Structures are given as structure tokens and as C-alpha cells.
Amino acid sequence: MMQKSPNYVKKRSYWIITHTLVAILAVLVGIRIGSNVTFRQLIGLTSSAFDNNQLARVVNRESPITQENVDFTLFWETWNRLEKDYYDTSKLDAQKMVYGAISGMTQAIGDPYTMFLPPETKERLDEDLSGEFGGVGIQLGYRDSQLAVIAPLKDHAAAKAGVTAGEYILHIKDDLQKVDVDTIGMSAEEAVNLIRGKQGTLVTLTLAQKGQDPHDVKLTREIIEVPSLELEFIDAPQGKTAHLILSRFGDKTVQEWDQAVTQINADKSVKGIVLDMRNNPGGYLEAGIDLASDFVDGGVIVSQKGRTSTQNYPASRVGRLQKYPVVVLVNKGSASASEIVAGALRDRRNAKLVGEQTFGKGSVQDAQKIGKGAGLNITIARWLLPSGDSIQDTGLPVSVEAIDN
């Protein structure tokens, strides 16, 4: 499953594991190109042409972009030749061609977290963070530039079938939709669109852990409604332990968290806290800062290193839980915002991290809303722990190794 207050200041910014943490559960006309020219201005596409599913007439062949080193001649020549020579005109869908061109532009950068999101994909990602969506219960991302399972969602189809974090997704098959494709070169949003579908229908995934043989898993799609936080109390002779199980940093996480904190502080027998962020792919950075702030007495929670400067993000609230000792549970499915919280508690509270080394997503995406309901996720920075360390691609090491049951 991070958006400028979008993930670090605005609420609608999030770190994409796309992890989703693209976390991403199977993810223009109006987009800015250059400094002051929109794609609509560049190609003169009309909404009526799209509505009629016809190839739009390009009226502005010469790019009005002011940069002298940008030449769109090859682009227009390709468009013209397809329009003129391609034998099956029914496949010349102007809208898809525009989306494909924009996707190619972002993919050319070579950063899997910088991506164009067509309206349907953008809508689905928003659903993911809201906690209600249809699918098989998998957060998608990348490992070694290959599509992979970041985290299976508890009590849903993938987890029940034994799917585990870190498995590569090699192939997707859906007989009903006539889908039978390898995932090499596939974007996270493409995989999301293929894996999601109508409730009760089947999709088969070919999965493999690194160095192991692939295996097929047949999953039945379902409607998924998942709270982001669960609280349970564990009794012990010396007092209760509050076990906070945090599955993502979504739209309702801070609200759910505040309710849990109230419960914990109301129970005078609570002596400690276990913050469980195993298989948490991330989400809104703002939520992560709020939660981490409850454990500390002010100070920096995370820093963001951009092109030209570094910005510090301090604690956003009074530390209501700072009197309790805390242990943090993580694993290889813990990514992005969950790594920020774990790292902040390690550096600021000397909290012990228990479990497995984390995923290692240390980049910041600005999740921008653009025309026609589409989205554009742009990597704008790396985030740094209070210690100044980056965990990009390396993850957080743990103090005590433990294997998930």
C-alpha cells in the first residue's frame, strides 16, 4: 500500500509502495508537460472524440513547448502513421493511446513509484486507502524491479490461501476476462486492474519466493472492508499489555488511533504497548507522523530530502503514550510510513524492533490529482530517519529476529 500535504503535509499525499507500498491493490488530457502547456493544448483532443470512441483529430501538430531541446516530431509522426496505416481501426482508441503515451513518459524515468494513474486506477487506489474495495486482499509493490506481494490482508482470500509477503507475482490468469499474461514489465496499476474484478469470480496467480519454484494460487474475489487498526489487551501478572495491530495508514487511521489511545489511557492496569506493523505497506505520511508523535516528547519524526533542501517534520501532537515502554513488531512486509514510525520510535524512544528486516521504501511520492479524475505520482524526495539514515532498498534491521507464526 505514501500523499504534498498530500503525504507529508497535506492529507491527500501518500507514499506509494503503491507498495500502493505502490501499495497497491490490484491501481489527459490536462496533464502538465513542460512548464506551462497542457496535453490538451499539445494535441488538441476533444471530449466528443473520446466519447464516440473514435481516434481524435490532432489539430496542434507542432508542440508549443518553449524548451528548445524538446522535439515532438517523432511523437506526431508515430501518431499520424498509426492513424493512417494501422489495419484494424477499431483498436485505435485515442483515449488509450493518450494514456499509454503518458504512462510511457513516466516509465522512461526508471522509477517504479513515479507513475501515471488513469481515472479507474486512481479511483481504486483511493478506495484502498479508504479501507473498502473489491479484490483478493493483496498489497502490491516491487522487489528487485519485479511485481511482488508486499502484504496479504488478514482474513481475506490471499492470506487464507497461504500467499506471503515478498512473493514475486509472475503470471496472472482470468479465464472469464480472457486474461493470461506474464507480469514482466507490467506496472502495478496494470496488475491491480487485472487482479481485481467482480465479487465471486476467480483469478489465478503464479507466485514464487526468491530462489524457489513457482506455484499457482487460485483466488476468489471478494468485497473487502478492512479497519486499519485493531486493539487487544494481553493480560499478564505484572499488568496488561496493549497490542495495537496497524495494517495501513489510511483515511480513518488517525480517528481509529485516537479511540484506541483513549481506551489505553483509561485502563490503569496497562503497563506497556506492542505496536504491531507487520505487513503494513504504508499510506499517508501525515497519519504516520501523528501516530509516532504520541510516543515522543516533541522533536523531529522524519526528514525529507528533496532536490535542493531538506525539510524536517516535527512531532504534531502531545505524546499521550510516551509514559509506556513500547516494542515494535515489523517484517519484510512493513514498508514506507510504517518504516518511518518504526524508525522514529527506534531513534527517539530507543524502542526495540522485533521480527524481520523491513521492506526498504524510503522515497516520497507527491500524489497529484490531474484532469479527468486521473492521478500522477511523482517521486520528489527521499525521507530520512531522525538519525539521518535512509532505508531505501535496505530496510530497517531489527534488534531481535523472530519469524512470523
Task: Give residue spans per PLM region.
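Cleft-lining beta-strand/loop regions that shape enzyme active-site pockets
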Residues: 90, 159, 164-165, 173, ...
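Extended, small/polar residue-biased N-terminal targeting/export presequences
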Residues: 83-151, 200-204, 208-231
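PDZ/PDZ-like domain segments forming the peptide/carboxylate-binding groove
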Residues: 131-181, 381-382
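Hydrophobic beta-strand signal
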Residues: 170-171, 377, 392
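Conserved functional hotspot residues or short segments at active or partner-binding sites
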Residues: 108, 390-405
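Terminal targeting/pro-maturation regions of precursor/exported proteins
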Residues: 2-113, 145, 267-268
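Metal-dependent DNA phosphodiester-chemistry modules and their immediately adjacent helices/loops
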Residues: 336, 386-391
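Short acidic, Pro/Gly- and aromatic-enriched capping/linker segments at domain boundaries
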Residues: 372-381
